[in-house]
Amino acid sequence: MRSFILACADRVVEGATLGAEEALRLAEARGADLHLLFAEASRIRQHFTGNSASLCSIINAKSGRCAENCAFCAQSAAHKTDAQVYPLVDEEEIVRCARDAERNGARCYGIVTSGTGIRPGAELETICNSLRRIRSETAIAPSCSLGILDEETARLLKDAGMVTYHHNLETSRSFFPSICSSHDYEQDVETIRAVKRAGVRVCCGGIFGLGESFGQRIEMTETLRELDVDSVPLNFLNPVEGTRLEKADFLTPLECLKTIAIYRFMLPGKSLSVCGGRETNLRELQSWIFLAGASGMMTGNYLTTLGRKPEQDHQMLADLGMGVGGCS
């Protein structure tokens, strides 16, 4: 296994593309071989993306009563949870939170809303006005996560100042029906394609620990590679009481790190950011995400769960000898 890991890493650094079968074999690493896998993933990261980390923050700008039935989501109307329910916050609140995110060291700021998608009207106007102000009043790069989107709306948001559009596939095509039946996987794929046609950067990844196999995690890397997304958020399930997956087990820290490492081998030049579930799944090994190939993380709170203080994340990066890079 040791020689196979080293050979795969060398090939990736030289520009080769690994296949799913090779990734599955890498995922068999255990013990000292697993530590070598992490080290080589970190070498690939430094070769392609350098030794700085991108930091992003989000605002839950509209919460709850989502018509989708995603098994993991506290905001789904199909679940009974303690998640807050409120309409779209006003422009002032969106801009205020952008300033707070910038002050806390984030370089990217996501406006996230619950629901299947957004249509022309007052909500879209509020978001566009907020984007214009964020671009003129701060140096932070704004992104949006508004659900399923068409090309025309993507262009409107881009013209208002949106730099990146975030839309997760959540999991592989083969496992998706086990997680969500309220829309089709192809609608998510078409959203990514529409955003790319509009000339907007794409942030697209998923969530792990839903019951998928490791092979299905690798399957998603192939879809992400085919779509040529720009950055990939990696989330780890933090089970919420009242959701369909409330009794799911947390992934072990080493399982999370192995997933990050395999994603770095498969998507060597992409920004890989660890987001939701970092604290609860990785626990004392949070700093290892970068030693396993990640190149960024979300800082501050998540949509419906708490994160940790931004100062702790900055100290972690300083302890690792890493700087903070731009939005990637």
UniProtKB/Swiss-Prot annotation:
Keywords: 2Fe-2S, 4Fe-4S, Biotin biosynthesis, Iron, Iron-sulfur, Metal-binding, S-adenosyl-L-methionine, Transferase
Cofactor binding, note field: Binds 1 [4Fe-4S] cluster. The cluster is coordinated with 3 cysteines and an exchangeable S-adenosyl-L-methionine. Binds 1 [2Fe-2S] cluster. The cluster is coordinated with 3 cysteines and 1 arginine.
Cofactor: [4Fe-4S] cluster; [2Fe-2S] cluster
Keyword Protein biosynthesis: no
Swiss-Prot/TrEMBL GO biological process terms: biotin biosynthetic process
InterPro entries: Aldolase_TIM, BATS_dom, Biotin_synth/BioAB, Biotin_synthase, Elp3/MiaA/NifB-like_rSAM, rSAM
Presence of keyword Transport: no
Pathway linked to the protein: Cofactor biosynthesis; biotin biosynthesis; biotin from 7,8-diaminononanoate: step 2/2
Any one GO molecular-function label of the UniProt entry: 2 iron, 2 sulfur cluster binding
Domain Radical SAM core per the UniProt entry, residue ranges: 48-278
Catalytic activity: (4R,5S)-dethiobiotin + (sulfur carrier)-SH + 2 reduced [2Fe-2S]-[ferredoxin] + 2 S-adenosyl-L-methionine = (sulfur carrier)-H + biotin + 2 5'-deoxyadenosine + 2 L-methionine + 2 oxidized [2Fe-2S]-[ferredoxin]
UniProt-listed Enzyme Commission number(s): 2.8.1.6
One Pfam family linked to the record: Radical_SAM
Residues where [2Fe-2S] cluster binds: S143, C203
Complexes and interactors: Homodimer.
Function: Catalyzes the conversion of dethiobiotin (DTB) to biotin by the insertion of a sulfur atom into dethiobiotin via a radical-based mechanism.
Homology family: Belongs to the radical SAM superfamily. Biotin synthase family.
Name this protein carries in UniProt: Biotin synthase
Natural source organism: Pelobacter propionicus (strain DSM 2379 / NBRC 103807 / OttBd1)
Organism placement in taxonomy: Bacteria, Pseudomonadati, Thermodesulfobacteriota, Desulfuromonadia, Desulfuromonadales
